[in-house]
Amino acid sequence: CIRFTLEDDLFYESTLRNLAEVLKETKTMTWISLPCIGGCPYTALNRQRNPQKESKFAMYETHFKFMLEQVDKVLTEACIARSKMANDDGIFVTDNDVYNNTTTYVKYAPLIVFELPTKNSYWTVDYVQAFIRKRCLTKFPLHGCRYNLRGKHGIAKGKLLRKEWTVACNSHNFGSRIATQCNPSICSPSEHARVSGKDTKETGNYTQELADQVHRSFA
């Protein structure tokens, strides 16, 4: 497992080269989780209340879009490189294969998982929807409470948190293995706490239970 975090800025060419090199390996999974504060419901409210800060809010989306474009570019380069390294049938992936989702592209594409909170507005923007179509991604629900996501502060401390993610991936087998939804008939809504305060930022971190399931599903 190789993590690309805030220290590995996607604005730097060195980061892109390192990422492309990793993705050349035969069995790789690319879990894409980008800063998405610009699309969260709270940001939408703040934009309405603080129109004088519109340039700041717009910058969030500009950065998100740029980083997704960079990841998309690296995925294409890696897919082409993987096909050339394999060279088992003399057929290489081309840019045209990627854009048209040909069987050649599907054969050499790494496992791709794109994650955003379910209610994040970035799911609705054109360039994210285009990325999903281009990479043949299917959406799956991922409810944090089923992976023991609990509050750590205030009245929510120790309670399960109502946090919903959606993952879009190009493997139905993998997606179905990590997908999970809260069942109201088993888990009472009263057992949940809303994400707020200090817990809001911290829920951006995955639980150990979720990380373990991701690794088991990919193994």
Explain the meaning of each model-derived region:
Residues C1-A219:
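Conserved active-site and SAM-binding loop architecture
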